[in-house]
């Protein structure tokens, strides 16, 4: 795979597509376009390329596509094929004060790769492939534009290794996106999140300088960890072009369990006890009764599915802990795990729901075990209180010794009599209020407003409060590394020289 997968067609001819977000867009003049063309393998100002580069998988954009609109198009799409070309593009744009929005598979759901202020969309899919692999030390170099299936097939077929990173967007996303958004995979309890896997980075700064961070050993005490500075920065501090990662032998053993709990809180406590004892099954997912009904046809219980893969001795020990801590639960058919595996990455219903008039999205947050049951109840109640809500539900998707991620789903629909103009306004108001309710409850509980989807545009308005005084530190780092503010402006809630950040 070498190209992004659009979430839904745009219902307009390329030349008729319009921008939905109202912002001051920066043009690329003929001279800069020529110089970029000389520096980069491919540049395009074709309407169809600009339209696709003007959106990602942000759910609001699905509804707009049905009206022939995208969030915001760039003036030009640049497609480099190596780090030197990325460096040249950034140096030229920095000199010209033209914004640059880096992107890979554009599978993000928070608008992080939308070029809000026009300028250049930097498509990194051409920087693909697996570099050096040290099978003895279990270290591999992966280029930023490599899509998930190509990572796993390259490591497994050639070396008998796995990265162990399996996000829901596996088929749609790239190494660079995983790093930039601080992603997490479905097997993360065993293998860690992307920040646990990465050892070092190659990064291009706003002025074109190429820097390498970390990667020289399993650990160092050489000042602050600069690798982690860029992980989760969403392209606002630099453009990641390559990463060095810990990898693992493909495991020999696998085991599965499925049980049900009388309450979501009871299931959460079982997960807490499992992690507390040091067991870390790759998959430990707890669904509330609403989602248990939707996913497993078991609305009478709160389903916990468990899947682990490891050396057989370690696997047996892990599953023994799971069995002991779930002894009081209802035993369920382990085929529920097969059912999850078959559908875990299926998001085919998303676009049809939006096109049918249903507003639907997911919000993942994280908090300590001590507050999770109360946070779950508070969010589901708050979402249910937003006028128009059809359903509000949750599952626990990633767990730690000290807490877990709650992954909420909400869906709403405007009143039947709403006319098209009124419906458009209703969608924006409902969507924003639903997000506000989840985020407010999370902040009040002392939790993290995002676990693995990132901030992008959609959550930018919350980050200053979510980080507190540390947000000023982030803004200072941004100013130091990108003094002209060209890198992905309008994201993470950071100040931008290009004008007010638009919102629908």
Cite the ranges covered by each PLM segment:
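N-terminal flexible segment immediately upstream of the FAD-binding catalytic core
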Residues: 1-91, 108-138, 289-295, 336-360, ...
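C-terminal substrate-recognition/cap domain of FAD-linked oxidoreductases
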Residues: 44-64, 249, 255-437, 441, ...
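Short, ordered loop/turn segments at secondary-structure junctions
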Residues: 104-107, 168, 286-289, 454
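FAD-binding subdomain of flavoenzyme oxidoreductases
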Residues: 129-285, 486-487, 499-504
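Activity-critical C-terminal alpha-helical subdomain
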Residues: 209, 456-504
């Amino acid at each position: 795979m070498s190209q992004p997968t659009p979430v839904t067609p745009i219902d307009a001819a390329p030349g008729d597509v319009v921008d939905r977000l109202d912002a001051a867009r920066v043009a690329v003049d003929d001279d800069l376009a020529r110089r970029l063309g000389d520096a980069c393998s491919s540049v395009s100002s074709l309407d169809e390329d600009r339209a696709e580069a003007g959106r990602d998988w942000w759910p609001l954009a699905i509804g707009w596509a049905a009206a022939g609109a995208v969030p915001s198009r760039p003036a030009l799409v640049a497609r480099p094929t190596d780090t030197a070309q990325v460096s040249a593009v950034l140096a030229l744009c920095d000199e010209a004060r033209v914004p640059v929005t880096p992107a890979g598979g554009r599978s993000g759901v928070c608008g992080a790769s939308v070029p809000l202020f026009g300028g250049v969309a930097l498509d990194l899919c051409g920087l693909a492939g697996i570099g050096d692999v040290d099978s003895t030390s279990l270290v591999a170099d992966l280029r930023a534009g490599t899509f998930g299936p190509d990572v796993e097939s390259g490591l497994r077929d050639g070396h008998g290794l796995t990265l162990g990173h399996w996000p829901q967007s596996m088929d749609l996303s790239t190494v660079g996106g995983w790093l930039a958004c601080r992603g997490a995979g479905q097997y993360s309890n065993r293998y860690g999140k992307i920040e646990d896997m990465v050892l070092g980075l190659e990064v291009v700064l706003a002025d074109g300088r190429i820097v390498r961070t970390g990667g020289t050993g399993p650990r160092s005490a050489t000042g602050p960890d600069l690798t982690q500075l860029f992980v989760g920065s969403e392209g606002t501090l630099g453009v990641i072009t390559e990463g060095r990662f810990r990898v693992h032998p493909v495991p020999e053993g696998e085991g599965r369990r499925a049980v049900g709990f009388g309450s979501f809180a009871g299931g959460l406590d079982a997960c807490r006890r499992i992690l507390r004892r040091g067991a870390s099954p790759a998959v430990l997912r707890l669904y509330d009764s609403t989602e248990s009904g939707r996913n497993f046809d078991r609305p009478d219980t709160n389903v916990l599915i468990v899947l682990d893969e490891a050396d057989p001795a370690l696997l047996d020990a892990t599953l023994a802990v799971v069995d002991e801590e779930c002894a009081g639960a209802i035993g369920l058919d382990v085929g529920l795990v097969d059912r999850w595996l078959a559908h875990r990455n299926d998001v085919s219903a998303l676009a049809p729901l939006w096109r049918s008039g249903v507003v639907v999205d997911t919000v993942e947050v994280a908090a300590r075990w001590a507050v999770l049951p109360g946070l779950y109840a508070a969010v589901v109640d708050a979402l249910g209180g937003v006028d128009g809500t059809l359903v509000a539900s949750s599952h626990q998707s990633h767990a730690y010794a000290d807490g877990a991620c709650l992954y909420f789903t909400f869906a709403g629909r405007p009143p039947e009599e709403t006319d098209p103009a009124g419906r458009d306004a209703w969608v924006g108001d409902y969507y924003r209020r639903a997000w506000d309710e989840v985020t407010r409850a999370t902040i009040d509980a002392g939790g993290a407003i995002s676990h693995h989807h990132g901030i992008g545009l959609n959550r930018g308005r919350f980050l200053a409060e979510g980080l507190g005084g540390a947000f000023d530190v982030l803004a200072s780092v941004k100013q130091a590394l990108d003094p002209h503010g060209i890198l992905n402006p309008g994201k993470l809630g950071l100040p931008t020289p290009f004008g007010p950040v638009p919102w629908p």
